[in-house]
Amino acid sequence: MDKQRVIDLLDQLSPILAGKEETIGKELTEKLQSALLVTKKDVASKDGVALATSLSGFVQTISNASLPGTNLRFTDQEGPVWEELKALTEQTREDGLRGLHLTI
């Protein structure tokens, strides 16, 4: 996985999330920004299954905030950042599981 690309995507996602405060509220915005910062630190310091778990947790947090009945929506311009981060996370998870199966 290209850790630098993931960090770049997280950096791009940060102002996108900050801009959603009016629609999703200050509390949820702060929660998502906090989760983003933790994930960014994890990307820099973790590898393998630990990294995949952290990224998956972050993607799940954002996905939950995007469920029907919530107000988090990405515009056509913002969507590609989110979609690429999800795709990289899925690939990392699959690679981590593949490595786990090889060691068992």
Q: What are these language model-derived features?
A:
Residues D2-V6, G25, L32, A44, ...:
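Intrinsic-disorder-associated interaction segments
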Residues K3-V38, E94, L100-H101:
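Amphipathic, heptad-repeat alpha-helical segments
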Residues D8-L9, L36, A50, S54, ...:
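Acidic/proline-rich low-complexity IDRs
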Residues E21-P68:
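Amphipathic alpha-helical interaction modules
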Residues I62-I104:
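Amphipathic alpha-helical binding modules
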